[in-house]
Amino acid sequence: MVDLTHQVLPQSIAEGSYYLQQSVTQFPRGTVFLAVVDPGVGSSRKAIAATAGGYFFVAPDNGLLSEVLSQLGGLEEAVELELPADASNTFHGRDVFAPAAGKLAAGAELSRLGRTLPDLVASTGRTTIFREGQLEVTVLTIDHFGNVIFDFPARRGWEQLQPGNKFLIRGKRITFWPTYSRVLLGESLLLWNSSEYLELAVRNGNAAEEWGVKVGERVLIEALW
């Protein structure tokens, strides 16, 4: 059993989705992922178990799995988990999700855990907006170093993001480079992080503090011609 993280901000479905997406392929097929970011606990949202790409997932049906399922080629099968009569109204992670994950890890068939679902709730809040020479993104997460990761993977493509090109963020100029070492200590830059997501960083510094941004905020990046 591997404990991936407990550092996802409370109720931040998008941040939880990002970490799940980055982690899944580091594990062998057949791995069961228990993922609980559940601001809707006790509501009508479904508790689910699903499979894609040879992996299994147990989670609330609130969009948390959307990105990782898409990454793995799409949903293959999903079921709605039944709530035990004595389940807490506020702690489904303990009373619903964890037991289901344990059953899957012990070899239970997914189809025996509940009734089949044709589809799942799609994620919301990770919408990138393109305009002429502009990119509006959301802060997905801020890592231990204070690096700011945006909801924009390299595969989406934006031709302006080339080494040496300059941009404007909140009135400040910044340059896109491939590595931290291309700038002086304390200087900011844009780059692709190790997961190929757009990152705002400060060399040997804390970009989140320097730029005053928080998880969930929208940020406008303007290309300077």
Language-model features, listed with the residues they occupy:
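A conserved acidic, glycine/proline-rich C-terminal tail/linker
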Residues: 149-212
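Generic secondary-structure signature for well-ordered alpha-helical cores
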Residues: 25, 29, 70-74, 102-110, ...
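Active-site histidine-anchored catalytic micro-motif
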Residues: 3, 7-22, 26-37, 42-95
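Fold-independent oxyanion-binding glycine-rich loops
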Residues: 4-6, 36-39, 52-53, 60-62, ...
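Anionic-ligand-binding alpha/beta catalytic cores of soluble enzymes and soluble regulatory domains
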Residues: 88-151, 156-161
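Structural motif
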Residues: 1-2, 31-34, 47-49, 54-58, ...
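Surface-exposed interaction regions enriched in Ser/Thr/Asp/Glu
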Residues: 215-223
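Solvent-exposed alpha-helices and their adjacent loops that cap or buttress functional pockets
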Residues: 25-29, 41-42, 49-52, 72, ...
